[in-house]
Every structure is written in structure tokens, then in C-alpha cells.
Amino acid sequence: QQLAEFVNTPHKNALLLTALHQNFNAYASKLDASQKNEWTKVKGRFQEIVFAEPVEHLLYMAAESMANKYPVDVKQANAIYEIARQTKFVSPALTGEVMRGLYPLDAFSAVVLTKAIQKYGQNERSLFSFLNSKGANSLSDFRSAHNRTYNLSDVYDYIINNFHSYLSDVNEDSMGWSAILVAIERIETADWQDEDIMKSALEIVKVIGMLNLFGNAGFSMPH
């Protein structure tokens, strides 16, 4: 803050330019209220110029790194890509070839995961951490099956487990995440006769929640 104030004097004829790997507020996420207030003062001395790398570019790099790593169900990958394209969920710049390279991620899960990482993580670093991670909810631990990709429900679980500290703070998406949690709690506390149906209901709620949070303005939900 002192450095910013020093530079922010016209007669000094100086410019302070910094590069951050995440937004200003993210650095203060684990501070107490008093420290967050001080950090807000620091932020006020700067003008933020946000650079968001195109989702298509990040997914192209991811597809290149995943080449031949997983067996591809071409028919399934193409079918899901066509739905994503027709509903305008993906940009025309994102090709079917790239999507096949990302399998077992499908077109919806790949785009949502990347957008979430851009918002809550560290762009390329977080994306490639996901691609190479081990353990619960990871891609390496996922076993694809007939009619089963690493889908939006899986992405929801991964985001909740890996970005919980950020999501637990107030942010622009707080209401959306809260709505999903409320819906999940209602499902889990309902009287279900069939556990498999309950699991399916949970997956549907997670999918709808992810589409609502990360769908672009031109996206229309498929019927």
C-alpha cells in the first residue's frame, strides 16, 4: 500500500505494474476481518486489468497433454459435443477433434471445469493439476463406462472438494452455490424407497446447478 501511494503521486512520473496469478480478493481469503479490510485498502490503490485466457485455448492444450492417455468412445464424445454445439454451450472455435482428445471429459464438463478453474483457481496450473491429480473425484481415478463420461456431476464434486475455502467466502456466485446445496439437502433428507433413484436425483441437481452457474448468455437448456 505504501509503495502504491508513493507511485500514485503525479509529480513522481512513475508507473507501478504488477502481475497477479489470481484476483486481489483471493489473496485475502484466509485472513481475519481486520486484515481483509486492510487488504481492501491495498486493492483500492490499483486498477485491475483482468486477462482471461480463452477457454478454447486452455482446452486445446489440455487435449494435447491427454493425447492417447484414455480410450475414447468416439460416438459418445461426438454426440455430446453436438448437443453442446447446438445449444450454444460451446464456442464454434471448440472443435469436435479437441473434445475427443479430452475424453472422458465431455463437452459440457470440460468447459465448466475450465471456467471454474479460471474463476476460483490459477488457470493453467489448476487445470493441469486436475489432469494429473490422484484420488477421489480425480480424472485419473475415474473409470469410464457405457454411457458414462466424467460429467457435470463429477465436476461439481471436484470443485466442492478442491475450492471449498474460496466458495465458503462471499463471492459473486455465492447465491448459485447456496441454491445447489439447499436442493441437495432436500433430496438427501427426503424419504426415498430406492437409493439409486436418490443418487440420480442428486446428479441431476448438480448438473442443473453447473449449467446455471457457468452457461453463457446464448445457451438454451436442451429439452
Predicted regions, residues:
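Terminal-proximal interaction/regulatory segments of ATP-powered molecular machines
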Residues: 189-223
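Substrate-engagement module of ASCE P-loop NTPases
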Residues: 2-15, 37-46
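Secondary-structure capping and boundary motifs in well-ordered enzyme cores
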Residues: 101, 105, 176, 196-204
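Amphipathic alpha-helical segments of the small helical/lid subdomains adjacent to P-loop NTPase cores
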Residues: 27-142
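Generic, well-ordered alpha-helical scaffold segments in large soluble proteins
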Residues: 2, 6, 65-68, 116, ...
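Structural recognition of the conserved hydrophobic beta-strand(s) that form the central parallel beta-sheet
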Residues: 12-26
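Long, low-complexity, charged/polar intrinsically disordered regions in eukaryotic proteins
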Residues: 129-194
